[in-house]
UniProtKB/Swiss-Prot annotation:
HAMAP family: Hydro_lyase (MF_01830). This is Putative hydro-lyase OB3382. It comes from the Bacteria. Its EC number is 4.2.1.-. InterPro entries: D-Glu_cyclase, Putative_hydro-lyase, UPF0317. Belongs to the D-glutamate cyclase family. PANTHER family: D-GLUTAMATE CYCLASE, MITOCHONDRIAL. GO terms for molecular function: lyase activity. Keywords: Lyase. Coiled coil: none annotated. The lineage of its organism: Bacteria, Bacillati, Bacillota, Bacilli, Bacillales. It comes from Oceanobacillus iheyensis (strain DSM 14371 / CIP 107618 / JCM 11309 / KCTC 3954 / HTE831).
Length: 252
């Protein structure tokens, strides 16, 4: 399905699930919306932390259509999260009634973009096979501070067979705007993850820990995690795993 048709299914509420595996070859994006007074500091945070926050588009104040998609960012994601004063308020399927003229929207690259390349090279992705939202975890890996924005990186995890890991690294390092190569391979406790079966975002997956190794990529949910520390009066984001599918091909 073309991204435009897929986004229409989100807008009409026909589909509100994860976007993993959808619209092969097209960039998917994490989204953060903040009041203008926070926008410069957040932009600086992203520039200082390109591994977890690779910016692919920034919309001007009040604008709702990005350059990289013929879309309305208020309706064309399957699910959104609304945070108020550092707390999750609710999950919704559109944000039209929450929109403000002073909102600035940031679109950040997503690791879903490189998943097709992994599959084409014979690497199984268990979260897709098990129809789960990819598991994501808070870590002890610090991000570089920018103004009020500071905190630790969030990572996504894919459990791979040992012989697949080198291949996965070489494939994903080409996707710089989609988090690139892994930030950690192996023991999750080394990056502050105490329970691999209990992710902070997304859903757990089942895998044989004797036969598969957890591989972790920087994740665009990092800004949501950091935003909780800043506690803006309102912050809107994609629900983890529920991205904006853009019209931009991954090769560009």
């Amino acid at each position: 399905m073309h991204p435009k048709q897929q986004r229409e299914s989100f807008r009409s509420k026909q589909y509100t699930g994860t976007t993993s595996g959808m619209c092969d070859n097209y960039l998917q994006a994490n989204m953060i919306i903040l009041p203008k007074e926070y926008a410069f500091e957040f932009l600086l945070f992203c520039q200082r932390n390109p591994k977890s926050c690779p910016i692919i588009d920034v919309l001007e104040e009040g604008v709702t259509t990005p350059q990289i998609a013929d879309a309305d960012i208020r309706t064309d994601l399957p699910k959104y999260r609304i945070y108020r004063n550092g707390q999750l308020d609710k999950e919704v399927t559109d944000i039209k009634d929450k929109w403000r003229a002073d909102f600035v929207t940031f679109l950040i690259g997503c690791s879903f973009t490189f998943e097709k390349a992994l599959i084409e090279n014979g690497i199984r992705l268990l979260h897709q096979e098990q129809e789960r939202v990819v598991p994501m975890y808070k870590t002890n890996i610090p991000c570089e501070k920018a103004g009020r924005f500071e905190g630790n990186m969030v990572v996504s995890m894919r459990a791979l067979e040992p012989e697949e890991i080198d291949k996965a690294v070489k494939i994903t390092e080409r996707f710089e705007t989609s988090h690139g190569s892994p930030v950690h391979i192996g023991n999750p406790e080394e990056i502050g993850i105490k329970d691999i079966d209990n992710p902070d975002y997304g859903e757990s997956i089942s895998f044989d820990k004797k036969k598969r190794t957890p591989v972790f990529w920087a994740c665009g949910v990092t800004p949501q995690n950091v935003g909780l520390n800043v506690k803006p009066p309102i912050m809107i984001a994609h629900a983890p795993g529920h991205m904006l599918i853009t019209d931009q091909l991954e090769e560009k």
